[in-house]
UniProtKB/Swiss-Prot annotation:
Residues 75-204 form the HD domain. Residues 1-14 have a biased composition (Basic and acidic residues). This is Deoxyguanosinetriphosphate triphosphohydrolase-like protein. SUPFAM superfamilies: HD-domain/PDEase-like.
Amino acid sequence: MTEGVEGRSQERSDLAGFAARSAESRGRKYQEAFRDHRPAFERDRDRIIHCAAFRRLEYKTQVFVNHEGDYYRTRLTHSLEVAQIGKAIARRLGVNEELTEALALAHDLGHTPFGHTGEEVLNRLMEGFGGFEHNLQSFRVVDQLEERYPGFNGLNLSWEVLEGIVKHSSPYDRPVGVIDRFLPGVVPTIEAQIINYADEIAYNNHDIDDGLKSGFITLDQLDGVELWREVHEGIARAYPDIDPERRKLQTISALIGVFIKDLTTTSLENVQRLRITSLDDLRRINRPVVAFSPATAEKNRKLKGFLFENLYRHYRVERMRVKAERYLRQLFESYVKHPTLLPRKYQKKMEILGRERVVCDYIAGMTDRFALDEFKRLFEPYERV
């Protein structure tokens, strides 16, 4: 990778020795003549914010389909929450906040409409054609699919951002396979490791909020979860006259704080115990250092188990999943059978990428709303085309 001149003096001078630094980046795929001197990771963050795929996250959902209500989280609000949590952790660990923020904002760019159901459906439909995995799709978005700059496709992000995207993992993800450009088998930067946990902290706690708002879960049910009960009771003791709604919101806020404090304390202990003083040390030791303590990890496991059984498998969520699968399957099969239904620029890509992959890219880029409207246009006789 090569890179034009980017700002070096503007980078924080108080970063920990094991932090990633823009000045030490492995560079970009394409050399550019930059018009200003922003540090590399700051530029990456800005490019992600201004790309089309990031804007579309506003109408891609987490658990609830977009038209179910305006209150519920979308992929955009989730990404912003991950960025806030990730930066808070990065600041406490003394690592690069700009790289952390860039990774947070990019981590869901490859997500399909209709949450994880969309990913599961596309992966089944793409069996025999390379499959589908949202981390790899996020990489495709920033490396190939965005069309903004003269001379190249993609966003031409720094090597460290791309590495963090392809090595992102959460309980929903599967291994993304070997990508030779990004040190396969080697742990990513601490900033990338932070995002794995910030992602989980954000969706666990904010799915509680959305689940309570929807009525799919109740406070009585949550009181059976040890960690929630401890914090919920603590808020009541601290604020005896607090109303139930504010108590709920303050409990969620305090839970996030509990996770951040435990994660940073445990991670710093790991860094010190392993005597990691540089990014090279981290790569050489090749062990993740960002982690919860065993006690908090167990409490978090129970919280996730509660959400899985009571929210993600709620019968109304299951109904949304079944409908979403029908929409995406019929769209995919129709586009593959009749490629002229796609915009011309996608038809032109089929000779190079193959019909199925182009259709997959097109559907993966849809918002919930666009997918629903497209389904109506194709399959409802009185809908305008």
